[in-house]
Amino acid sequence: MYKSITTLLKQQPQSILRNYSTDKFPRGFKTGTAACGLKKTGNKDICIIHSSAPCNVAAVFTENKVKAAPVLLSKQLLETNNYKGFNSLVINSGGANACTGEQGLKNAKTMSNLTSSLLKAPQASLVMSTGIIGQQLDMSKVEKGIADAVTTLNESDWISAARAIMTTDKVPKLAQKSVSLNGGEVHIVGICKGAGMIHPNMATMLCTVCTDASISEDCLRALLKHSVHYSFNSINVDGDMSTNDTVAIFANGSAGNKHITDTTSSDFLQLQEAVREVTTRLAQMIVRDAEGASKFVTIKIHGADTEQNGHIVANSISTSSLVKSALYGEDANWGRVLAAVGYSGVDIDPLKVCMWFAKGDGKDVGLGKKNDPETSMQFLEKGTPLAKDENKAAQLLSNNDVAIVVELGMGKASSTMWTCDLTEEYVRANSHYRT
């Protein structure tokens, strides 16, 4: 029944990689990378993103009470400067600079000031870090790495930038999108890292989105909040929340489109949808690359009384170790799913609940849907279990992409989350990774 972990690790990451167009990257942005020695592998561990024009910026940060030095510094810089006028971002991997006290904050400031100085940027650089918690950065290495990265700045090598921010990731994560707005075509690119400690609201995950759209700070903030809710706050790998996670979007206005100031305008809604598509693809890449994962799992909740309650139920299922273990074992254990629905905290009626397992994303599964018997099976009908062929169910769940669809019978709201199964490889990977 079980596939070998080695086979899975070879198969899954390749499905994440996507083609990208170097002529569709946002105008005015450059990236530079370097290997300074923070990573024992010798791989690149410094990334700089620079815009020739000052950017409006929006960002969301970890909700963990323990926040890393770069998170504290970047929040302060953004608030002090009203989220505008930024030209650069510096990221290091190989060290989280979290739980490092005053020295850690001093090191984050050094990274910020050195980057902006070398780039001759008028405003301090934002900072992100990722890696092991509780260790001071070797600043002699970091400072040399920043200087080296500045010399490599170019407009087309975003994939190297995505590689430079990886930690336990197996593959780089990059997505892009273009959209025609009033006054010109706008380009969007996003890179992110993350494979473990992934849980709403965000987790050990860094993401930077850059666009050449002209948009106000308030509109950019609203756009990012919407996009993150339906992407990074809708994924779960292991239920752990990190100290460092950050999502930031930079907009430099180089596309020449009509400046967006109204969140109800057609241009805003089109741009918001495009950014949401980019962040959703990146979020799904994180789940597909999750530590030890062999399955990409879509959880769809229908018939909730509110979207928020649907999200709570989906989250409860996605964090259940029993559900995730059963999926790895290709066991359609609907009882574990129903239990997770029941303890979610949402007031549901068990006698109204219907449930299906399916291969793929489950979009055609549920009440009033196609429900193709070749790709889906219903296991629960208004709280009553249905007799099913367990061998056929196991075959259905042998696919790399599977779905759990739950109908609550409470209303018309829906919610979707993405998660993965729980395997021996996850335990193995995290038993050898400090903090």
Swiss-Prot record:
The family classification in the record reads: Belongs to the ArgJ family.
Q: Share what the entry says about its subunit structure, partners included.
A: Heterodimer of an alpha and a beta chain.
- Recount the PTM note: The alpha and beta chains are autoproteolytically processed from a single precursor protein within the mitochondrion.
Kindly provide the name given to this protein in its UniProt entry. Answer: Arginine biosynthesis bifunctional protein ArgJ, mitochondrial
What's its EC?
2.3.1.35, 2.3.1.1
The record's annotation in Gene3D superfamilies points to: arginine biosynthesis bifunctional protein suprefamily, ArgJ beta chain, C-terminal domain, L-amino peptidase D-ALA esterase/amidase
Q: What else is known?
A: This protein may be expected to contain an N-terminal transit peptide but none has been predicted.
Q: Which GO terms describe its biological process?
A: L-arginine biosynthetic process; ornithine biosynthetic process
Q: Which reaction does it catalyse?
A: N(2)-acetyl-L-ornithine + L-glutamate = N-acetyl-L-glutamate + L-ornithine; L-glutamate + acetyl-CoA = N-acetyl-L-glutamate + CoA + H(+)
Annotated site (Cleavage): A203, T204
Is RNA-binding set as a keyword in this record? Answer: no
Q: What function does the entry list?
A: Catalyzes two activities which are involved in the cyclic version of arginine biosynthesis: the synthesis of acetylglutamate from glutamate and acetyl-CoA, and of ornithine by transacetylation between acetylornithine and glutamate.
Which sites bind substrate? T167, K193, T204, E291, N430, T435
Q: NCBIfam families recorded for this chain?
A: ArgJ, PRK05388.1
- Active-site annotation: T204
> HAMAP family given for it?
ArgJ
Q: Where is this site: Involved in the stabilization of negative charge on the oxyanion by the formation of the oxyanion hole?
A: T130, G131
Q: In which pathway does it act?
A: Amino-acid biosynthesis; L-arginine biosynthesis; L-ornithine and N-acetyl-L-glutamate from L-glutamate and N(2)-acetyl-L-ornithine (cyclic): step 1/1; Amino-acid biosynthesis; L-arginine biosynthesis; N(2)-acetyl-L-ornithine from L-glutamate: step 1/4
